[in-house]
Amino acid sequence: MKIGVFIDAENIRRSGGYGIRYDVLRDYVSQFGDPIRLNSYMSVDEARMRTDYEYKDRTHGFLSIVRSYGFKVITKAIRWFEDEDGQRIGKANADLDMAVEMLLQSQHLDTIYLLTGDGDFKRVVQALQNMGIRVEIVAFRYISRELLHEADQFLSGYLIPNLLPVLDQRAEDWGAMSCRARGYCYSVQDGYGFMKYLDIDMRSWRDIFFHFSQLPERHYVNLDDVFEFTIEPSPRAEGGILATHMQILHSRHFIPDKGEKPTPVV
């Protein structure tokens, strides 16, 4: 199986994926086949680089790290404009470059992992599928519904172990007892529910029980909600586990304040 990865880095950064680990992403897709193309499309402020040497060194250092993991980095210079109010606005849209290269390089690929939530890629996904390419979307928050519906499969980036590191936790502690992991809700009952989360090996899914008392305040749980939680031994089921200290990461709706309308997150 020949695999390609195409990352809309700016979209991912602005949509909950700031700080993703490129080495983890490479290792994740490698279990399904050979990663032939690994492309990341990033924006850089070339004007700032000419005067801010700390920013320049930091940017070059980051790009070098990403390249060391086997990724080709395609940079797009930020162009600055003034809006009608005189405010300075920067734009660096790499969507066209990314779309063209996906179409050109797809003839050598079987599956493409597309990291973006941008609905502008809907037609590109359709074109790739018409060429016999499987397209899987990985994103965090603010995913276009149209893009979601076109994908052959969607996986929240939060669910890939350590793709986005858990705060103040070693990578090897993901899913260990009394440590944190992330999972999605697949069953809601009267006062309790169940989630699935990927084990540290990134291959096997595990089930975990949760009680509504562990939900964030004022959150009404929905199917497919994504949570970060602590894994603890169940006091009732021998060998069982339960989720505590649950934190919502991605949800369809939050319970509104009085007088507010429900606010969709996706």
Q: Which sequence ranges carry the predicted segments?
A:
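C-terminal helix of von Willebrand factor
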Residues: 149-177
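Domain-level signal for Mg2+-assisted phosphodiester chemistry and nucleotide/NA-binding surfaces
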Residues: 1-90, 94, 119, 134, ...
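A short macromolecule-binding patch
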Residues: 202-213, 242-243
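Short aromatic-glycine-enriched beta-strand elements
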Residues: 190-198
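Short nucleic-acid-contacting surface segments enriched for D/E, G, S/T with interspersed K/R
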Residues: 213-230
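VWA/integrin I-like adhesion module and closely mimicked acidic/polar interface patches used
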Residues: 122-152
